[in-house]
Amino acid sequence: MFSRKKPEPAKRRQHDLSQFGLTEIPDDFDPSAGYGEDDGGDSDLEAELAAITGGEGAKPKPKPKAKLLPASDLDKMIADSLRDVSDDDDDDNLESDPDLLGELSGIGGLEEAEEEEPVAQPPAASEEPVQTFLPTTTVDTLSIIKQRLEMYKQAEANAKTAGDSGKARRFGRGLKTLKDLHRQAAAGKSINVDDIPPEVSVKPIGGQAPPVPAEESPAPSTPASPPPVPSRAAPDPPTPGTPVEPTTSVAPTSPPNPLVTQMRSRQTDYKAAALQSKRSGDISTALQFLKVVKQFDVVIKMCEDGQEVDLSDMPPPPAEFLEFLKKMQEEAAAEAVAEPTAAPEPTPVAPAPVLAAATNMLEALQQRLEKYQSVEAAAKAENNSGKARRFGRIVKQYEDAIKLYKAGKPVPYDELPVPPGFGPLPTADAAPVAPTPSLPTSPTSPPPTASTSAGGTPSSSSATTPTAPRKAPSPPKPKELTTRTSGNQQKNNIAEQQMKLLLERQKEFKLAAIEAKKAGEIDQAKEYLKIFKGFDSLLNAASSGLPVDLSTLPVPPSQRDNLEASFAIVSAEECDPTDDICEIGVRMEEQLAKQLMMCKNTRDHHKAMGDVAGMNRFENLALTVQKDLDLVRYSKRKNEPLPKFHYEKRSFNIVHCNTDLTDSELEIVVVRGISYNVANPKDVDTYVRVEFPLLNDESFKTKTNVIRDTSSPDYDERFKVDIQRTNRQFQRIFKRHGVKFEIYSRGGFLRSDTLIGTVNVKLQPLETKCEIHDTYDLMDGRKQVGGKLEVKIRVRNPILTKQMEHITEKWLVLDA
């Protein structure tokens, strides 16, 4: 019950030996019996069996006597069997073997299958020897498949025209089968004739029979003329004993083209020469012959399509080809040497089309996108998936750039690759750049000629292959130098003017930085270089169509030097007012000088903060005030009437910042003590202990120096503490805690120090202010003990927000 199941013996699979290329051997095969003796064996055995059993059996039929050969034929066969057959004769016969030639042409002569060496067999002892064929595709099978392909194509077209969808689908399936068989036959594989779809009746669409030439019989039993031999198979015609199936021709057969016949004959010679060279081991020569064979296919197709072909350049026979190729290479080398001295004639190759000049950025991006899209399509047509994916990514980059440009957003132009033959992308101040004409790339190159050498480098002329004559290109018409601009596009719009101004101003700072570096002013050069880099963001915004506030632009270096050197030393006589006009002029000059000083100080403050926009705004304002001040001084010096002026109320938002500190520093300044309440005010020695809370119950502790013999000491000592303004725990310290100051009186000999008072300063104001500066009463617990302590606590910027101050000034402005 629980015993293991006995393993079944492995069954021997019955294989059909015919699929391995062997003849199927029957099960009752007797190797001891002779051929042709099976017919009489059964009757003899039956007669013998009847005699043994006592019955009278029928008399056996007499065996036919074997036909004896004459003695002369027997001697001839023996002599032939003893004769040695040379291998050269077999190789000569194999040069025109259609099977081997088809196989060599099918794989391009580079990856040929392992050849089977023919075995010399003695002639059979019969008058008619049986010819054996290798299981490869013959010329007749390939031609039959091609004829059936034409039949089924025409039949499918007729069925579709007649509206018979059932027939069209049936013919389509047969056409697909024929295409698969044709592909296998071209590769040299074995084709079963029974698998070829049968012939179909092809009739013209109009219902009338096609005209039949007078010399041909209309009977269907008459075999049609054999079709032209394809370039992949051997050109030898089929043997007379091989029957050709009759086909129904759609159109009357046209007489063969003598040019095609001549080229096919020469192509056949080159095929045989390539096969012979390969067998002899000369691979390079075989490759050259195969290249010529492939180039013959191109020219034959051109001739069959009705194009004009010049046979004066057809390669010579294979025996003379190597000398001819060597001569052509020498001529090409001579022409290459003579090329710099003699101006060559223009080649008949049509020049590449010159694209129109791009008038704006969008058009330039579109041109480059179309270029990469064409290269991607060519790569897909060549089945080059790697190249197609690579150029597909570039196409996606350009599509995203065009979307960003249309949306008015900044576009990373420096990340976009430039296709060959195209110049840089146009800018606002540069003229439109047209892509330079480049040589045609490989997808658009003309078909290869037979002048290709063994190494793959083409010769200078196409004298080795018959090619179609090309027409000389017509001279290009002169293009207009001006580019038409659409009506809704303004050439000098605001965005382009801003771009031009920004580029000019950036160039000035670049030159100023170079000059400052040459003069040895490294700090000044660094400052100019920072301003030069700051223009990049403005240029990106302007190129994307965003408006730019030109009032925030930095003043050019030349005007800045004039602004710095605007102050002049005047004498007392020049400042004495002589009358009311001089008095008004002096007041105006003082007011303008005050305004100028305020602008320069605020400019320096914003510069130290790193606020470039604020610095540029006040610098431009200072430049305007400087011009007004110069005009007033000039009028006074020349005794001319003063210019008209008026006062305005101007508001300024000033950002307070302690620029001498960093963001991670807090400065504690113990300034002075005021009137300490002590017993000996003139002899007391005091100092201050400082305690600042830190994280994890730690604290920063320090003390000042001892100031002797005064109750109002000036300490003026500064201490810096490292803080972490982005840490939330540290922010809670500023909200809840404070700095503790303890004022001590120094004790005498063997006496300890005495606490005078304590001051606690809250840090919460530093959340919105950058400085705390005040005097605080000295406390003992909650009781004042008398005296005060002046303390200052500073940070670079407030902890939470920036400290803004709104200032309104009475501003003197000269009328234009």
Swiss-Prot record:
Residues 1-11, 73-85 have a biased composition (Basic and acidic residues). Residues 122-131, 424-433, 450-471 have a biased composition (Low complexity). Pfam families: C2 (PF00168), CC2D1A-B_DM14 (PF21528). It is a peripheral membrane protein. InterPro entries: C2_dom, C2_domain_sf, C2_Freud, CC2D1A/B, CC2D1A/B_DM14. Residues 145-200 are annotated as: DM14 1. Disruption phenotype: Results in abnormal vein, eye, and bristle development probably due to defective regulation of the Notch signaling pathway, particularly in imaginal disk cells. Accumulation of proteins in enlarged late endosomes, including N/Notch, possibly contributing to ligand-independent ectopic activation of the Notch signaling pathway. Failure or delay of abscission during germline stem-cell division resulting in multi-cell cysts that share a cytoplasm. Residues 365-419 are annotated as: DM14 3. Phosphatidyl inositol monophosphate binding protein involved in endosomal protein sorting through regulation of the endosomal sorting required for transport (ESCRT) pathway. Required for full activity of the ESCRT-III complex core component shrb/shrub, probably by preventing its inappropriate polymerisation. Required, but not essential, for the efficient generation of intraluminal vesicles (ILVs) in multivesicular bodies (MVBs). Involved in a late stage of the endosomal pathway targeting transmembrane proteins of the plasma membrane for lysosomal degradation. This is Coiled-coil and C2 domain-containing protein 1-like. It comes from Drosophila melanogaster (Fruit fly). The gene is l(2)gd1.
